[in-house]
Amino acid sequence: MKKPIIILTGPTAVGKTKASIELAKKIGGEIISADSMQVYKYMDIGSAKIRSEEMQGVPHYLIDELEPDEEFHVVRFQEMAKQAMKKIYANGHIPIVVGGTGFYIQALLYDIDFTESNEDSFYREELERLAKEKGAEYLHEELRKVDEKSAEMIHANNVKRVIRALEFFKQTGQKISEHNETERAKESPYDFCYFVLTDDRKLLYDRINLRVDQMVQDGLLEEVQSLKERGYTKDMVSMQGLGYKEVLDYLDGNCALEEAVYILKRDTRHFADRKS
């Protein structure tokens, strides 16, 4: 018999946190975050991380579990989420996966296998060199030439995933997007319900703009400055997240604060559109 799991997803600022708490309290659920940023310690404001008082006693997993210099990718998410699910089932409760990153959710839901090929260290080093010499956008364009679908799904700043997709294509001759589609076609090992929250676009945009303004008021600049002082740098996966890379540009003197805030609002709206 398949074990139950609930997925609750939707765009930024749509109200997933509040809905997930209400749902968990009604059905006896525990929450697993599928957010690629909230897993990191010290990154509270920019990730819109749930506060302990907001949890209302509902257990949460994959929140504040990694240091910002640690890598967090889909395979690690699968491993950590499965461990959390074991605990939740042992407690007699239902896992509620909230987020977040759709790719991560699909990987968990359909138990997608990402271990088909081994790493090619020589080719990987060559791609890393190209990224440093010619920039992330150049490497992203190389991916677009061989796997346009993956290029649409992977942000140019996520150099590690771009390299992995290029590496997979070189080793197998297959697009990693096609491989993942094949894996997704498998039957899920879980009895799942999948909910997508949505709202009027204008209302959503207004909430996003207000949220960004509130983040700045709450100390986003100070949070990013503190991360810098701890030695965390822009080339780390954690520091490439929305809210962090824009403020880093400001703190590094590459743009004015008004421009950084404008870009953050704009990119967050675009990000929300992709999840709607």
Language-model features: where?
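Phosphate/pyrophosphate-binding catalytic cores of soluble transferases and nucleic-acid-acting enzymes
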Residues: M1-R274
